[in-house]
Amino acid sequence: MNQLVSICMPCYNAARYVGPALDSALAQTWPNVEIIVVNDGSTDGSGEILADYEGRGVKVIHQANRGQCAAANRAYGESSGDYIKFFDADDLLSPDFITQQMARLDGRTDAVASAEWGRFHDDNLATFKLNPQSVWRDMEATEWLVEAWSDARSMMQCALWLIPRQVLERSGGWDESLSLINDFEFFARVMCHSEEVLFTPGATLYYRSGITGSLSGQKSRKAVESAYHSICRGTGHLLARRDDPAAKRSCANVLQDFIYTYYPDHSDLLAKMETRIPGMGGSELVPGGPPKFHALRRFVGWKAARRIQRLFGH
């Protein structure tokens, strides 16, 4: 039976990208797909572009700007599918993406399907390169979180996942108080209400990088507070399910990475993170950075090296 899959897309000021994203959704080979786009108060002409797609079977809903999470929840609330894929308005899916993920799930309603991904830059797919990760395999769901967070470099982008409606009914929708890295908290919660992650080789997400003004690039106080709360809540979901040393260590590494990322700014949030890490057993995570940063930190320590890096902008 060809069960219905709902693609739920929030769209805010994505006029440059939403057409190709929807084209990739419309090109899916799975025969029973509905596409729901919520135009979240766009002011750049996205609404006019979306109007052209309504005649091609895309359901478009317009609302005043309420944020990405509210738009995703609205799209989900309007959906009817047995399986749900949340999809950003600036990325691309390979044509067999949903067909392959549905084959992996094979009717299961207690597991989620994951996928391959890679980045491309400057609207040029010739720059695309897969980014293999250790979690590209079938795994128990909470073990996926432990492994993905172990180096604090997890990729939890929404389009990677095909989620049974029954899982979402247990986990709940997107947290509308969050903006930056909202997917961290959401998918931690989804995983904690799933039994297994089934990896889907060949299902490829083309992740667009380098977009000026993108949500992931925001560094305002409000955005950083969102990242802080998303990390605290997301790690809390995992630790409520299991508190073994491996889980605690991975959570500590995620908190430590937040400190590395935002130091020396937002000192109050960094201090709060620092107080939580010892209770998780500590972190031995090394800060990320270019070769010059690592060479410098060996002599002056990571904090001084980060300040110098910020001062000179590289």
Where are these regions (language model features)?
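Catalytic core of nucleotide-sugar-dependent glycosyltransferases
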Residues: 202-211, 217-245, 265-282
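Short, surface-exposed helix-loop/turn micro-motifs enriched in polar/charged residues
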Residues: 178-179, 199, 243-251
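Membrane-interface aromatic/basic loop that binds lipid-linked glycans or pyrophosphate carriers
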Residues: 267-314
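Hydrophobic alpha-helical core bundles mediating ligand binding, dimerization, or RNAP-core interactions
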Residues: 184-187, 231, 255-258
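Nucleotide-sugar donor-binding/catalytic module of glycosyltransferases
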Residues: 1-225
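Amphipathic alpha-helical repeat scaffolds of TPR domains
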Residues: 249-261
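Active-site activation/catalytic loop segments of kinase-like enzymes and analogous catalytic loops
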Residues: 122, 260-267
